Amino acid sequence: MARPKNKEELLQQATENFDKLMTLFNNLSDEEKRGTFPFETRDKNCRDTFAHLYEWHQLFINWERDNSNGQAKPFLPAPYNWKNYPDMNIKFWEKHQTTSLETAVTQLEKSHQDCLQIIETYTDEELFTKKYYNWTGSTSLGSYAVSATSSHYDWALKTIRKYKKSLK
């Protein structure tokens, strides 16, 4: 699927990919939902995958809120940057090892809605014009929104499909 280029496409892809993800998950048996992926090195189950998505939603939500309120903050919290962010993902994984699957699902569903609500408040121009906001650096707000939602859901879909295929 092509990367969204406007607000309508972004909202549509984010919603469709999220719905596909949740349908795929909901069609697993209870045992399969709690099963271990035989192939991942970091995210080892559905809970880990959902917690990862939730944490990236939080990055987007907090970054947008702070910057739109005049508090200049980078997308990735210190001490992380785009060279070492895999270390941050490991910290997210560690943080959620005691999170229940049910909590991970609930958090993800809410944070998904929160992201959509944020996206809704912006125009196409505000979302997809590079450097429209100085706090987006050389890219656009929409690019960050795509990364936090639709493209990340695509990754999660591929991960859980791969897991489902391994069950056969």
Residues covered by each model-derived region:
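Extreme N-terminal tail/first-helix region
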Residues: M1-T23
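A short, mixed-charge helix-start or loop-turn motif at secondary-structure junctions
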Residues: R3-K7, W93-T98, S138-G142
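Short amphipathic alpha-helical segments with heptad-repeat character
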Residues: E8-T15, F50, Y54, E102-V105, ...
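Generic anion/oxyanion-binding catalytic loop in active/binding sites
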Residues: L10, P38, W93, A104, ...
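Solvent-exposed, charged/polar functional surfaces in cytosolic regulatory/catalytic domains
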Residues: K20, L24, D114-I118, W155
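Short, contiguous alpha-helical
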Residues: T36-D87, T121, L127-K168
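Acidic/histidine-rich alpha-helical segments that form the ligand environment
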Residues: K83-F128
